């Protein structure tokens, strides 16, 4: 009896059309920040969004961006506009922006 039920179940499953859709991969072109900017951090200050991201040894300037809509970003400046000091030339990543309302200052922390 169990064998008969098993055969009936297999037959029913075989008769049911299984539609398998091929998985297609499409390239999504929607960069949040221009260029190679891993580990971004974003904060909102008075209706504007501010962002920073990991730099690298080839460009250790630590860029700062701002946006009003989280889509269109403007490069504002760099933490080190004249080039990073020797102590900050490499191994800095995963920044974090923090805003102190009382002082009206933005702090930028990096993992080293």
What spans do the regions from the language model cover?
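Bacterial N-terminal signal peptides
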Residues: 6-16
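Carbohydrate-active catalytic/glycan-binding domains of CAZyme proteins
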Residues: 18-112
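Positively charged n-region of N-terminal signal peptides that target proteins for export
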Residues: 1-4
